[in-house]
Structure formats: structure tokens, C-alpha cells
Amino acid sequence: MKLEMICTGEEVLAGQIVDTNAAWFANTLMGKGIECQRRITVGDRLEDLVAVFKERSTEADIIMVNGGLGPTSDDLSTEAMALAMGVPLVESKEWRTKLEAWFTRNNRVMAASNLKQALLPEGAVMIDNPVGTACGFAVKLNRAWLFFTPGVPFEFKRMVKEQFIPFVEKQFALSESVSVKKLLTLGRGESSLADELDVIQLPEGVTLGYRSYMPYIEIKLFARGQSAIDSLPDIEAQVKKVLGNGIVAENITTLDQEIHERLINSGLSLSVAESCTGGMITSGLVAFAGSSSYLHQGLVTYSNEAKVKVLGVNSQTLDDYGAVSIATVEEMAKGARGILGSDYALATSGIAGPEGGTDEKPVGTVAIALATKSGIYSQMVKLPGRSRALVRALSTAVAYDMLRRELLGEAVIVDYSSFSRFCK
């Protein structure tokens, strides 16, 4: 089966918005063992849409068309498909009824232009949109099924999960088994990872890919066919042996997600005191529903005065060692934990740059501490040559990983090999 995607819209083509739908779609389908082999972006020009629908329908088996189903004059996907098929547009009585009910239910007056959304190419199969006004539909042209969906992300994603994937599984025999394993690494670049893992011989049916979203690189092991799936545990073990502590999580997207889930399940609590990370540790956790069950407080104590008055850091410690020091960050973590009696507390203090560094403590020097009931773990990491944003993101990730390792009963301070450090 050959799957392609056509994305529509001048704003996407011009780069005015980032097409997150396409990335999500390809990643979601890959998890089902369905590879998207081509993606095309087309602007809001009727003749271009007609041409690309005709052309790709002779090459692909199924085509996801995203966007252009709205009520405005530049929403042209439905009209273009009808022209490509050589059929008229006809009103779907079923969708018009649903459309009118949607506006009534939401206490809104339906504009006459919205009736355009009930028009479908003659012979089209209506695809329900349970959360919006744009009617999805599927048509057969030449060798391809074309599946039309709205560009609104939450509408699109729901229709893919509830309508498109079952449609594909019904229309095409997807009998071959697939398995995907994802490993999250911290601090390394793609080229470095590729060089290190080049020693691993991949059996037939197993592929290894990388996805960068710094500070993380995700390694994806994809196996197609039972023989390849059976070999996956051995390949995974080889990857882990090569990368060691560089692997910080499995089958999740970010460390904050793992920390959130582990704290939820453990019933343990956390406080956070941040300087150079400026709330990033706290913000990452608050993004997940239910974080109030474990997150006691998130304090941004940027100034020395705040460190002293809010966290109880000894002013003599600041005078003797400076704000960016293991001694200071340990007192920050201890103070944050003590305010509300949290089980754990994380603290950071560093020089994110681009200015403020010294010979002894250059830009990229960050102190991180984890306070527990039994003691304090701390380390100073050196992140030279990174942007301010990346220094802060890496520092946040290292703090998360220290807590993750503590929750798992592992060594809290480890060598990531991708940046230098020293600890107390």
C-alpha cells in the first residue's frame, strides 16, 4: 500500500504557520506500521489542487488531504475534487442536519456561507467530524482513495484516529506485524549518535531512525515482520550497551512526562527552586493534568536577595562561593524542600549566557541539586558553546533525570558523556 499526504493552504505553503498536522500524522501512522511515502503542500489555487489530485491519484493507493474544507472563498478542496472527478457538488442532507444542530447546540447563528460545508462531490462517502463543522469525505479516483479532513488540529486528529485508520485497515489488508521501540537520549547530537551506533548490524526488517527536538534525540527502532520483531530485544540491548547513561527514558516523548507519571503513581511530593532555568522545570510539569497532586510549589529565586529571604540561603555562602555554586544550590534545594515538607526538591543556578561568564565559571556553567529526606545530591555541569535557550533546556532535563533516577533507585549522578561536569 502506498500512502501519501496532500496539505493545503497558502499560509502553510508560505511558512506563515508550521504544519504540525503532517508531522503528527506521519508519526501516528508509522506507529501502526503504515509509512507515509510522500507529502505535498499546495496553495489555495483551484487549478493547482485539481492538477495534484489527478496526478497523485494515479500513483498512490490512499491519499490524506488535509485542509480547505471551511466555509470561506479560499477553502477549495471539495470543489477541486469534484472538478478532478468530473462530477457536480451535491448537498448532503445528513451533514446539513448535523451542521444546523451543531450551531443550535452551541447557541450560534449559522451564516449562509456555512452551507458550503454540506456540499460534497457526487458519489463521495461522508466521513463524520464529531467536533467541528467541516464534513470529511472519501472518494475513489483512478487507483487511489482520497480522504479529506479539516485543518483544525483537534478535529483532524480525532478523525484520523476514529475514521481514517479504521478506513485504511478495512480497505487494505495490513496483515504484517510491526513493532516500534523508542529510546530517549540526552545531550548528544544526531551525527554523534549515528557514529556510535554504526557498529550495530541491523537484521532485515529492522530500521533505526532519529528525531531531534533538543535537548533530546529520540532513537526509534522499527521492526516489520515477525522475524524482525523477534530480533528487536537484542538490538535494543545493543543500543543500550553502546549509549549507557545517555538513554534517559523509553517510549515517552520527554522527561517531564516520565517524572509526572512517576510522581503521580508514587504519591510523593516535589518543590522546585529555580534561578537560571526560570520556571522551566515547574512549567514542564504543570503542563500535565493532575500535577497539583504532587507539585507543592515552584519558586523562581533569581536574585541573591530572593535566595536568602525566600529559601534561607546563607548570605555567607553566597559571598564565599557565589550564586552559581554547589554550596548555594544545595542550600536552595534544602530550603525549598523545608518550606512545605516536600519529599523532594530540585534547584538550579547557573550562567545561561550569552554574557556573565568568567574564566572559572564560563557561560554554560550550571549547578543542580536534588534534596531528599536522606540527603542532597548535587553536581555542576559545563555546557559550553550552547545557546541560552539550550543551556536552560539541558539544565532542566538533567534536573528531571536526577529525580527520575532517584525515583527508580538508580545512581543519581551519572556521566552523560556529552558534556563535562564535576560533583561535590
UniProtKB/Swiss-Prot annotation:
The record's annotation in InterPro entries points to: CinA, CinA-like_C, CinA_C, Competence-induced_CinA, MoaB/Mog-like_dom_sf, MoaB/Mog_dom
Q: Which CDD domains match?
A: cinA
PANTHER family this protein is in? NICOTINAMIDE-NUCLEOTIDE AMIDOHYDROLASE PNCC (PTHR13939), NMN AMIDOHYDROLASE-LIKE PROTEIN YFAY (PTHR13939:SF0)
Note the NCBIfam families from the entry.
cinA_nterm, PncC_domain
Q: What is this protein called?
A: CinA-like protein
Name the source's superkingdom: Bacteria
| Pfam families hit by this protein | CinA, MoCF_biosynth
Q: HAMAP family annotated for this entry? A: CinA_B
Q: Which protein family is it in?
A: Belongs to the CinA family.
In which organism is this protein found?
Shewanella sediminis (strain HAW-EB3)
